[in-house]
């Protein structure tokens, strides 16, 4: 029998698969979320004041009065770290990399650069680890990446300099992003295909819980070095438990290693208490393969070109706004720990809400995505019309804090929807390529996001204007995409001409290419169903 039939025998979601979900979609995501937004606390700037007696006699300057004196401003533009060290005093409420290495004033950009370094590492990790796991196996690459992730993360806490810290943040990002992607692929390949969406939803939900958990931990641990090291205890526990999980049966089967695949399946069956099940794996004698598309095919066909450009921008905006609002939680006033916790917890309602709406005929994928993006954009844009410092009357409720949380709720819902929507818009022959290309732009948004909150130095509401304008624009552009609810899943390029896939007014538009016509007969005309394996290059809901 084939591997899918074998899963029906051993159990598609038995006790052992539930354990794997708990390990790889709950505990692991709590840890992954912590590393992703680590800089939100350890990069925060404690309250401080300036003692400029030597430069400006008989004056004392606080961080609320910076720039009032021309002499002070001129000095600040050229001051180096050692000079700043002599004249600034931080409060003892908590320590951070900003207070230890004096990353304030003209050096404050380095905090954002360290966060951007992490997301640059994620960008590299999701590309390289997908290919490595396809070649060497899911389990081996996952465990190796996880071990290095913990090693580099602990090194963060012992960084002797800012430069060492920034480099290790890049390495943590590469290992964290790569191994968490492979872990989710491994999880999906150990359960029945009907449960893949469930595993993704669980992972996304506990990523949000992980943000709140990190805020709680930071509230009790005020030393940034201690915090950076202790958050790895949870990761170490997950790593040790992961040493005993099997290799992916689907990957082994795809490599022709049938005896090892059978061994992995019997391992799962035993722990599912299916002791009497017996089977023998065989590859199908006659298997037809669909020709796969290339990256250039995304831009060769007119229909795909328009959809791809819009989707790339939407993915970019989702990541930019999601991480921008999360990392700027400390700039909203009040307790930084409460703000960060609320920023995570506010995501939880978005999961059931968006899943319900996208399956309703009167909303569907397109309208729901557009509604959440536009609502989030408008919530952020309204901030520009509010007074900077006024929390009385109506402004006690409608303020930058509440509107930021509304924006976080809506962008989280949009992020969840765009994964599902994108996979339905692309034909099977190019689905992985399309998802991977869109994911690249998501990573670019994550790299830029840490710098956007710094725009508050120019104008206090400017970060919200950026988030709002991009969110609203992406929402309006999403209306140009076709609806996919209850439409048949596209298989080949020729399926793009299906009426049910097209927007009103596109019926007469034939499938056209931007370069000389490409023969469609390169796409297999065989209709026989093939065995498909979950590819590690395909992004999932688990990896924001």
UniProtKB/Swiss-Prot annotation:
Keywords linked to the UniProt accession: Amino-acid transport, Cell membrane, Glycoprotein, Ion transport, Membrane, Transmembrane, Transmembrane helix, Transport
Glycosylation, residue list: 58, 63, 80, 106, 286
PTM summary: N-glycosylated.
Gene3D superfamilies for this protein: MFS general substrate transporter like domains
A Gene Ontology cellular-component term: plasma membrane
Residue ranges with Acidic residues bias: 526-544
Highest taxon of the lineage: Eukaryota
CDD domains: MFS_SLC22A15
Membrane topology: Multi-pass membrane protein
Transcription found in the keyword field: no
Signal in keyword set: no
Start and end residues of each stretch annotated as Disordered: 513-544
Its job: Organic zwitterion/cation transporter with apparent specificity for amino acids and their derivatives. Substrate selectivity and the transport mechanism, symport with sodium or facilitated diffusion allosterically regulated by sodium, remain to be elucidated.
Similarity field: Belongs to the major facilitator (TC 2.A.1) superfamily. Organic cation transporter (TC 2.A.1.19) family.
Protein name listed in UniProt: Solute carrier family 22 member 15
Organism: Mus musculus
